[in-house]
Amino acid sequence: MVAKQRIRMANEKHSKNITQRGNVAKTSRNAPEEKASVGPWLLALFIFVVCGSAIFQIIQSIRMGM
């Protein structure tokens, strides 16, 4: 008897899931904007490394060219 009840509950849950597919709750639809996941210091470090390596590469290519 318990197994039949479990199967019935699973069938109801599955059919409810099928009928509500595509319906998004209003709370998750109008979520506020999230902050950037990267902090300003980490962003500054990343820009420093990228620009510094580009400048270093330019200087190195000028030295090798002469």
UniProtKB/Swiss-Prot annotation:
It is a single-pass membrane protein. It is found in: Membrane; Endoplasmic reticulum membrane. One of its GO terms (cellular component) is cytoplasmic microtubule. Keywords: Endoplasmic reticulum, Membrane, Protein transport, Translocation, Transmembrane, Transmembrane helix, Transport, Unfolded protein response. One of its GO terms (biological process) is endoplasmic reticulum unfolded protein response. Residues 1-31 are annotated as: Disordered. Residues 17-30 have a biased composition (Polar residues). The chain crosses the membrane at residues 39-59. Interacts with target proteins during their translocation into the lumen of the endoplasmic reticulum. Protects unfolded target proteins against degradation during ER stress. May facilitate glycosylation of target proteins after termination of ER stress. May modulate the use of N-glycosylation sites on target proteins. Belongs to the RAMP4 family. Interacts with SEC61B, SEC61A1 and the SEC61 complex. Interacts with CANX. This is Stress-associated endoplasmic reticulum protein 1. The gene is SERP1.
